[in-house]
Curated annotation (Swiss-Prot):
Main location, first listed in the record: nucleus
Sequence ranges assigned to domain PAS in this UniProt record: 115-193, 277-347
Domain bHLH: 44-97
A molecular-function term among this protein's GO annotations: DNA-binding transcription factor activity, RNA polymerase II-specific
PANTHER family linked to this entry: CIRCADIAN PROTEIN CLOCK/ARNT/BMAL/PAS
Summary of the tissues where the protein is detected: Expressed in many cell types throughout development, including hypodermal cells, intestinal cells, pharyngeal cells, and neurons. Expressed in every cell during embryo.
Protein name, UniProt field: Aryl hydrocarbon receptor nuclear translocator homolog
Alphabetical UniProt keywords: Developmental protein, DNA-binding, Nucleus, Receptor, Repeat, Transcription, Transcription regulation
Region (Disordered): 410-453
Assembly, per entry: Interacts with hif-1. Heterodimer; efficient DNA binding requires dimerization with another bHLH protein. Forms a heterodimer with ahr-1; binds DNA as heterodimer. Forms a heterodimer with PAS domain-containing protein cky-1; binds DNA as heterodimer.
Length: 453
């Protein structure tokens, strides 16, 4: 009985194999099928994992590219940054935003100013206005009311009008390139002196991001109501219209779709500011009896207001490059020179002197200040304003107390009124007094040889 119950394992396996052979199936087929099924499962698992990883990498690349467009530091780069650089700049940008928001916003506004007064001050300082243009149609969708003090135009003059109608015809191609966002464009340079657009043959990649920055000439309204428009330089004219140089900075913003099948649209959001070179240099543009001079550290005049020719009869080309104190009466040269040295030592300057004209000397009040570079805190230049005394105050005029040394001046004899011969040019290029009895002569400008009689 016990022998019937006991079964040898080897005999059992042998009996099963014999049964499979009796049924016509080889003994190793099950093992091969199991191996093939295992290999297929591993292959399918690997392929599925690779597909999942590929999709994950594509999504990560897409989000990082969107992040690069949102971070200003990445958008300002001239090349496409790598992913690590994008993440690093994004973290830095977020830290900066968090640092700004942590501060109290009310600390930026003085307590004695209302919100409306602060708004007007900001608009006056910015000297610009905000506008929005549709990239597909070129129509102006929005313009701020601050356009009136800048261009002397109303909002209705811009709204729903094509931007090409509001800018100089020579700048229309440039604006079209900025709106379309093409990757390759021909370089176009605006010459501020001639007003023409120069084309360079080389092609370049102009738009690496959604940010935009360009200079164009915009139409202005009537020049008479606002003195700021009358003194704005340079002014361009075309077909009876006046144009002024504006610097536009902004970015391209994608608008949400209007429907399921609606085409994608975008718009340019930008701020237009007056070009710095277009603004008058003097502090009070309405004043007709003063002119400004910019003086370098060595005392030479590097810039002179164009109104100097109307006030003293000498053009700015004749004075630029000369020493500032050579413009004064010989008896006042030392006073002006000493005041200039004191001004460089952070001392205030306001003196009464006599300045040279083409035929005589006239009294004026000179006030000056020293301009320092706000970034490097280094000396840049001195800005001096010459206020010509009114005719009724000339008799009561008192110059700054000084005892001049009896010496000859570059312009003529001591204390004498200048004549036209005082402005002759020597072979060395300096101004010299001519011999007594020399024939009278006027300055004549020779582009090749300088000043000739």
């Amino acid at each position: 009985m016990a022998q019937d119950i006991f079964m040898d394992p080897w005999q059992s396996a042998t009996s099963f194999a014999m049964e499979d052979e009796d049924m016509g199936m080889p003994s190793g087929k099950y093992a091969r099928m199991e191996d093939e099924m295992g290999e297929n499962k591993e292959r399918f698992a690997r392929e599925n994992h690779s597909e999942i990883e590929r999709r994950r990498r594509n999504k990560m690349t897409h989000y990082i590219n969107e992040l690069a467009e949102m971070v200003p530091q990445c958008a300002s780069l001239g090349r496409k940054p790598d992913k690590l650089t994008i993440l690093r700049m994004a973290v830095s940008h977020m830290k900066g935003i968090r640092g700004h928001t942590a501060q109290d916003e009310t600390s930026y506004k003085p307590s004695f100013l209302t919100d409306q007064e602060l708004k007007h001050l900001i608009l006056e300082a910015a000297n610009g206005f905000l506008f929005v243009v549709c990239c597909q149609t070129g129509k102006v969708l929005y313009v701020a009311d601050s356009i009136t003090p800048v261009l002397n135009l109303k909002q209705e003059d811009w709204l729903q009008r094509n931007l090409n109608e509001l800018i100089h015809p020579d700048d229309q191609d440039k604006i079209r390139d900025q709106l379309c966002g093409s990757e390759v464009s021909v370089n176009k340079v605006l010459d501020l002196k001639s007003g023409s657009v120069k084309r360079e043959g080389a092609s370049t990649r102009v738009h690496m991001s959604c940010r935009r920055g360009f200079i164009c000439r915009m139409r202005v309204g009537a020049l008479e109501p606002l003195h700021r428009l009358r003194n704005r330089r340079p002014l361009f004219q075309h077909a009876g219209q006046n144009y002024v140089v504006m610097h536009c900075t902004g970015y391209i913003k994608n608008a949400p779709p209007q429907g399921i099948n609606a085409p994608a649209s975008s718009c340019l959001v930008a701020i237009a500011r007056l070009q710095v070179a277009s603004m008058p240099v003097c502090a009070d543009p309405t004043s007709t009896n003063q002119f400004s001079v910019r003086v370098s550290e060595d005392g030479k005049m590097t810039f002179i207001d164009a109104r100097v020719s109307d006030l003293i009869g000498l053009s700015s080309d004749q004075l630029i490059g000369r020493y500032w104190w050579n413009l004064a009466h010989p008896a006042d040269e030392k006073t002006l020179q000493d005041s200039f040295v004191a001004l460089l030592s952070d001392q205030p300057m306001r003196i009464n002197i006599r300045v040279r004209t083409s035929t005589d000397y006239i009294p004026c009040t000179v006030s000056a200040y020293k301009f320092m570079n706000p970034y490097s805190e280094q000396f840049e230049y001195v800005v001096a304003t010459h206020q010509i005394a009114p005719q009724e105050d000339i008799n009561n005029w008192v110059t700054a107390p000084t005892v001049p040394q009896p010496q000859a001046s570059e312009f003529g004899e001591l204390g004498g009124a200048p004549s036209a011969v005082d402005y002759g040019q020597s072979s060395s290029g300096g101004w010299r007094p001519e011999a007594q009895g020399a024939p009278q002569a006027q300055w004549q400008w020779d582009p090749m040889n300088g000043y000739n009689q």
